[in-house]
């Protein structure tokens, strides 16, 4: 019974870490990556559609993204969606493709990005700890329903080890992303 709770908690913790990983991937570090456009949705015939389902996104150079919509009539909508998003890049279009030129990061912008990274990481840590708390509450409830105290204690210890493991993983991701961003 406790093993099922621990297994479920571990799955939820993995998902929390994956969310942080995806958030970090969407933060640009002066290099062009298609993942910075993952959250951009375009109004395609009145339906909000992810940009990566409407166009081919490629990286021909280190600081250039090229977006080639399959339907050329959607180019103005794609430009509007990029401008509205929090990407912070102005698109330029030649009628068939849209180019995004990623500017060099200023020291001020780098510091700002590090703050955003730390905030996202803290949200991830809090999510992992909340999962631990909820699972501990479930274990305590099961203990009242009759599972042995030593089994409950073992479950709580295992849960704490998992929590430490996933919080450490988030911390390592923060260090790596911080180094990537602060690299000039």
From Swiss-Prot:
One molecular function GO term is: ribosomal large subunit binding
Where can this protein be found?
Answer: Cytoplasm
Q: Does the keyword Electron transport apply?
A: no
**Signal peptide as annotated in the record:** none
GO cellular component terms, semicolon-separated: cytoplasm
Q: Per UniProt, what is one Pfam family of this protein? A: RRF
Q: Which GO terms describe its biological process?
A: translational termination
**Where does the protein principally reside?**
cytoplasm
- CDD domains hit by this protein: RRF
Against InterPro entries, the record matches this protein to: Ribosome_recyc_fac, Ribosome_recyc_fac_dom, RRF_sf
In its keyword annotation, does this UniProt entry include Ribosomal protein? no
Keywords recorded for this protein, A-Z: Cytoplasm, Protein biosynthesis
Q: Where is this region: Disordered?
A: 137-158
Question: Of which family is this protein a member?
Answer: Belongs to the RRF family.
Relate the protein's function as given in its record. Answer: Responsible for the release of ribosomes from messenger RNA at the termination of protein biosynthesis. May increase the efficiency of translation by recycling ribosomes from one round of translation to another.
Q: Which HAMAP family match?
A: RRF (MF_00040)
Name of this chain's protein: Ribosome-recycling factor
Species in which this protein is naturally found: Desulforamulus reducens (strain ATCC BAA-1160 / DSM 100696 / MI-1) (Desulfotomaculum reducens)
């Amino acid at each position: 019974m406790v093993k099922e709770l621990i297994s479920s908690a571990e799955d939820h913790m993995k998902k929390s870490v994956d969310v942080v990983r995806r958030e970090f991937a969407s933060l640009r570090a002066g290099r062009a990556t298609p993942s910075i456009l993952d959250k951009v949705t375009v109004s395609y015939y009145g339906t909000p559609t992810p940009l990566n389902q409407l166009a081919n996104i490629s990286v021909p150079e280190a600081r250039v993204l090229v977006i080639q919509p399959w339907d050329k009539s959607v180019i103005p909508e794609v430009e509007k969606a990029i401008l509205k998003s929090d990407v912070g890049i102005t698109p330029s279009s030649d009628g068939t493709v849209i180019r995004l030129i990623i500017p060099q990061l200023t020291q001020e912008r780098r510091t700002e990005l590090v703050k955003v990274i730390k905030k996202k990481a803290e949200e991830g840590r809090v999510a992992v700890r909340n999962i631990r708390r909820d699972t501990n509450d479930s274990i305590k409830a099961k203990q009242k329903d009759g599972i042995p105290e030593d089994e409950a204690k073992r479950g709580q210890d295992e849960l704490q080890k998992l929590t430490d493991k996933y919080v450490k993983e988030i911390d390592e991701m923060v260090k790596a992303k911080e180094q990537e961003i602060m690299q000039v």
